[in-house]
Amino acid sequence: MQGAVIVLVLFGITSGGEALHLLHLPATSNVAENAPPATLVHKFSVNLSVSLSPVIPGFPLVVNPRPFTEAFRVNRLSATNFEVVTTGKEQLDFERGPKAFDLQIYVKDDVGVTDVQVLTVQVTDVNEPPQFQGILAQGLNLYVIERTNPGFIYQVEAFDPEDTSRSIPLGYFLISPSKNFRMSANGTLFSTTELDFEAGHKSFNLLVGVRDSGNLEASTALQVTIVNINDETPRFTSPRRVYSVPEEVPLGTMVANITAMDPDDEGFPGRLLYSITTTSSYFMVDQLTGTIQVARRLDRDAGELRQNPIISLEVRVRDRPSGGQENRMQITFIVEDINDNPATCRKLTFSIMLPERTANGTLLLDLNKFCFDDDSEAPNNKFNFTTPSGAGSSRRFSQHPAGSGRIVLTGDLDYENPSNLAVGNVYNVMIQVQDAAPPYYKKSIYISILTRPENEFPLIFERPSYVFDVPERRPARTQIGQVRATDADFPRTPVVYSVSRGGSSLQYPNIFWINPKTGELQLITQADHETTSVYILTVEATNGEDRSSVTVTVNILGENDEKPVCTPNFYFMAIPVDLKVGTNIQNFKLTCTDLDSSPSSFRYSIGSGNINNHFTFSPNAGSNITRLLLASRFDYSSLDTVWDYQLLVHITDDNLLSGSTKAKALVETGTVTLSVKVIPHPTTTITTPRPRITYQIRRENVYSTSAWYVPFIVTLGSILLLGLLGSLMVLLSKAVYRHCSSTTRRDRKPLTKKRDTKRMNREAMVESIQMNSVFDGEAVDPVTGEIYEFNSKTGARRWKGPLTQLPNWPEPSTQHRGTAGEAPVPKHTGR
């Protein structure tokens, strides 16, 4: 920086004419230490250049002071006059700071001409008064424990810039003398007497002065506070020692106030701490105020207080939480009994059931066995009972003697009595138990007395016997009749009905059902007059106490509900084409029966299949036996074209009915099927093959893509089975290894108990084809003339008579298949 200033100066000199320069500089000036701000240090002026260019505002200024400082600045007085003053930013201290500063004054005008000169400022020494350092300069609080022996309290120290640096001692003294304190010349504060907190001042204010060699002084304040120590025992000030407390006072109720004082803390009672030293959960003490409050329910009538109502406590007062001084006092509380428990009972509701024939004067209930009063002292624990009340109970129940709580019966309890029925045979009695002492607490007792009915009357049916008629065609659930049994006893108990005997048929163990609640008799299935026309039943009724029975006769009224049944039901006949008219075809005879119709009531007619009316029956009515006759000859050259006739024969049981009654009467019709084959004139010898049955079994495996889950499940099951077998093999190998690695001594006992093998019965699923072996038709072989029997449903045939046993014919192969249009030949099933 100094090199830059020199360059500027040379530039100004070489610019031509008389140069800008500072007057009265360089120079040396003095300034006193601790000079205040704006203190004049030196004045100087500026000689302008020939051009008279003014000094730039802000110049001259101090640059590069040595040592560096901000304690000085240049003030402008006029255009050419200036002064150097102190700034106050830094304290000029002769003893601790620089004693001289070299200030370079730099000036510059508008045309750039500059000049630099040096001002040397010397700091001069000034005698300063001594100073107290730190918090001592602001005043100091000193604490002295009471009853401390007289002696040293504190060492006061001050600083003087001149004397301290030259090791000249300062002088200390008390500006305000005290008989309790003194101070030495070197600044030591002593106490001259023993200080007592309770007897004298609690604190002292001292003014301490210090003087240097130039007689300059300084002072500071000392406050000496006497610290109280705990040297006095607290004293109880409450005179009372016995207190009476009513029981059941609310928790937190103040029952006593213990007060005490401590001479050490006179005027500050809140500094004492109270506590209860004896073990008691009934009371607690506020440790700050000494008030004793109820901490637990005071029940004079229960627990230890019922035996001993006196509670003794020891109260301790201390002047600090731990250590210190303490005092103790014994106080006593007497818990007084009050009438706080109403007379009560272990049960407040009673239910009594009495037989209806209970005698008057019977003791029903003694309330004294259930009621009590928990109060501990008389008269609080005495009680009595009020007069019983309740609708309808005044003439039936009372106390004997009055107020004793002994309830006795005084009226009639007949269950069937209308007045008793009006109240439902239930009597609600209310009686109150109350205290004998104020405030006369009461509690209500409710007694419900129920009359238990007794079985006085038998259970009887309304009639000694019952007779019902029912037509045989009535369906199941048809109501036949109703029986009813009653009991004069109240309450009415439900009667349960049952059929104990009778009513069985060949197919059913009982065709009758009786409603167990209503006694209504119904049909389970249709009855059959022809099988059983009269049923005699025994119906039993019970109400849980009694049992009674009655005979019920059910007449099954007959109706025409059976169809005529004829034999044979199906028949096959073969006749030659030239059979004579009026011939009984193959001596065929039809025999019919009807369970509910006479033989003369049958009428025969041919329905479908009698083409051109070639066939008729004789007789066609009035008999149960008829024959099939040829009514007209066959003419295949003209109208006839059918060779096989399937005749549906109707047998009706209305022959005896007139035209007016036939429309209203029940008519049944049976049917018979006849097969007649007309045999043409033979041109060659016809051999009749033996009848046989050919079975063709065809098996075919077809795979459907929609059944993908079948192989998937099979595969998954196989994998799981293999995994299970593998795990079992591993477990087996481990078990064998453990067994083999153990002792080789033969075990006396078997490792496992032998299990009983269970016999497994395998059920074989057999698919059988049941052939109908009933041969219900006969026919004549037109070639041999022999008679054979046949089954109309399966087509099976067998020879009748000595040809029953036939030799076995070779069976055709099951793989044989007939050609198109070839019907399988039935297999002979002769027996």
Swiss-Prot record:
Residues 24-132, 136-236, 237-344, 346-466, 462-570, 567-693 form the Cadherin domain. Glycans are attached at N47, N186, N257. Residues 20-711 are extracellular. Residues 733-831 are cytoplasmic. It holds the Pfam family Cadherin. It is a single-pass type I membrane protein. Cadherins are calcium-dependent cell adhesion proteins. They preferentially interact with themselves in a homophilic manner in connecting cells; cadherins may thus contribute to the sorting of heterogeneous cell types. This is Cadherin-related family member 3. It comes from Mus musculus. The gene is Cdhr3.
